[in-house]
Amino acid sequence: MKTKLKILYIGLLLSLVNFQALAQIPMFSNPIIKGGYPDPSICRVGEDYYIVNSSFEYFPGLPIHHSKDLANWTLIGHGLHRKEQCTGRMNLVDVQSNGGIHAPTIRYHNGKFYIITTNVYQPKKDEPAQMINFIITASNPEGPWSDPTIVEGAPGIDPHIFFDDDGKIYYIGNHAPENPNFQGEGEIWMQELDSTSFQLVGERHFLWRGACQGTWAEGPHIYKKDGYYYLLIAEGGTSFNHAVMIAASNNITGPYDANDRNPILSTRHLSYDYWINSTGHADMVELPNGEWRMVCLGIRNEKNRASNMGRETLILPVKWEKEPYWWKEIKYNWPVCNPTTGKIEKNYSYFLPIKDSIYVPTQREYEFQENYIPKNWTHRRVPLENSYDLTTNSGYLTMYCKEPTIKERTGYNFIGIKQKETNFEVSTTMRFDPTLDGEEAGLCLIQKDDNYLLFDVKREDKENVLQLVINDKKKNPIIKKDLVMGKKFKNYIELKVIAKGNTYQYYFRYQSNDLWELFETTNSDILLSEGYTGAHLGLYATSNGTKSINFAAFDVFKLEYSYPPLKLKK
C-alpha cells in the first residue's frame, strides 16, 4: 500500500512540475492582428516579417505590419498614403462601400518590396464594377511607396506576383471563365509580366478552377519548393464555407494536380459555434529554420456567429508531409495545417524567440499634442481638402463642419480607428459652438455608410441638441433619443460609449468634474459586420449640406478594452 501511495505521490509531483513548466511557456493569442484586417499576405526578409491587408474604401490604404516573432505586430505604414495615388482610375475618392482595395500580395525581390492588388470601383449603382489591378513598389516597407502602375488587360481580382528562379516575373489572377460548369465558378490564370513596364506579355495560361467545385476560386499564391510549383487558393466565398485549397505541378504553366485531401484548411466541417469561422484566404511563409507558417482570415464568433471586428488575421503552423501512396507515380509533399488538430487554435506557444514587446495595452489615449495623426487613424475614402488640422487649436484635433453627410458616397468628415474587441469604452472631450442649423459633431461608431451610430451634438431650430442616431441597415436612420441641452451646454461636452455584453450604454457630462449621466442604452448587435470591413470608432463633423466655416475641437480621444466602473449622477 505504501508503495502505491509513493508512486501516486511521485506521479502527482511530476504532473505539478509539468503543469508549472507549461504555465511558464509564453503564449500568444489569435487573432494576431485584431480588428478589420482581412486577406493577409506575408513575406519575410531576413528575420523581419511583413503583412499587408485589404483596406477597401478606407484611406490611407494597404496597412503594413511588421514583426520579428510572428506574434507581436506593429503597424509601420500604408502602401497607399498619398491622395495622388488614389485619384483617376485608382479612385478612392468616391468609391462605393465594400469597393476599393481587395486582397493584396506583398513580396520582396532584389532589394525591393512589391505590393500587387485590385481596386474595385463601381461608377454608379447600376453599372458594372471595374477591376483595376495595379502594382506599387518601395525600397523601405515603411514608405514612401510609388505611384500605382496599372496592369492593363488583367481581369478579375486578388492578383499575385511571382518571381521565378530564371528571372521571369508572373502575374497570377482569377476571372470568371467562359462557359462555367456552375454558377460562381472561378478560374486561376497566369501570364508573364514585363520586368520594366509591369505589363502583361506572352501567352495567357489557365491553371485551375479549384478543388471541390466551390464557388469563387480566388486569392492565388504560388510557391516553389523542391522543384515543384504549389498553387494555393481560396474557395467557397468569404463566409462559413470558406476554405484553402492547394495544387501542384512540376511546370509553372501546369497542369496542376489537386491535393486529394483538399481543403487543407477550413471551418466548414466544424460547428457554426466554434470560436472562429469562415477561415480562408491564406498565404504562407518559410522561416529561417525551414519551418513554415500560414496566415489567413477568420471571423470571431462573438455574437450571432459574427463580430463587430469582421474578418481578422490569424496564424497557424504548417508541416510539409510526403504522400504515402505507393501506387502514385508522383508523390507530392503537401502542407498540413496545424498537424495535430487540423484547425486554428486560439492560443499557441511562440513559434520564434520573443524579440518584440509582449505588452498589449488595454488603453489608448490620444491627446493630439503632436503635429501628425497616428498611423492607425483612417478615413472613409480620401478626405476632402481642409477637413481637419492640428494647428488651428494647439493640442486639439480640429474637424470642420463640411457639407457631406455620413450617408453619402464621398469623403465625409470622419476619422477613426479599428475596433479590436467586443467590449470597450470609448470617450472624447469636445469643444463645439454650433451657430447654424445643421452643424453637428461628436462620436461616430461605424461599419458602413448605411450602418452606424452617432452620439453627438447638433444645432436644430436654433437649439443645441444632444442626440443618438442609429442606422442598423434594417431601416432609415432613426433618432433614438434627443435632448435639448439649453444653458447647461457651454460649448463643452464629454461623450462616452461603453460596450459590454449585450448592450451599448451612452453617457455624457457637461464638465470634467461632473458625474456621468446615462443618456440611453441599446443592443450591442447594431454594428455586427456583414460586409468586408470591421467597425471603426471615431469622430465626425458635418454641416448637413449647409455652407459653414465652423468646427469642433477634440481634446482627448480615449479607447479602453479594460475599464473601471463609472461614478454616475443619481
Regions found by a protein language model. Give the residues of each.
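Carbohydrate-active catalytic/glycan-binding domains of CAZyme proteins
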Residues: A23-K570
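Bacterial Sec-dependent N-terminal signal peptides
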Residues: M1-I25
